[in-house]
Amino acid sequence: MRTPLKIVLVGLPGSGKTTFGKALAKQLNFAFIDLDQVIEQETGNTISQIFEQEGEGRFRELESIYLKKVLEGIEGFILSTGGGTPCFNDNMELINEKGVSVYLDVSLEEIIRRLGKDAFGKRPMFTNLGDGEAILKLKNLLAARENYYMQAKIKLSGDDISTEQLLSELMVFFRN
């Protein structure tokens, strides 16, 4: 009998953590958990409201609290994290200790295509930024965060990452 895993997806905003995570969870018959949704449900505020009213520092604190809570909970889930989650409060260390981290390494061009004009405006980090500023911000985020993402146990690269690719990589983590 295999032990269910805690699979934690990391990567830039727009890398497909939620979309990919839902598909993978369905394929593995695991629960899908979106960390931002957990934070919103637990606090009663949207991520944007937390950023606006309490600042990024408080958001990162809440993010760490709920990340720890999720990772110490049930087994057999796929967790989609926020793009910055691994980069604060030793979160990547915790993720690697409690689960199998997977970095979705998607090109900036593909992320920009996926996010498009409308999606940039819906994300707190990109609020009130023009297209050029949003693209520059994304490039700066990658430069600042890639060191954390590269600590993931599995790295999947490409603009069309499949669940089959990850399942192949995950086989080593399924234990008898």
Question: Can you say where each PLM-predicted feature lies in the sequence?
Answer:
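ATP-binding Walker
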Residues: S15
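P-loop (Walker A) phosphate-binding loop of NTP-binding proteins
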Residues: L12
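Hydrophobic anchor at the beta1->P-loop junction of P-loop NTPases
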Residues: L9
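A glycine- and Lys/Arg-enriched "phosphate-lid" helix/loop adjacent to the NTP-binding pocket
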Residues: K98-A144
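ATP-dependent small-molecule kinase phosphotransfer cores
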Residues: L35-N96, K117
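Walker A/P-loop
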Residues: T18
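NTP-dependent small-molecule kinase module
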Residues: R2-T3, Q27, A143-N176
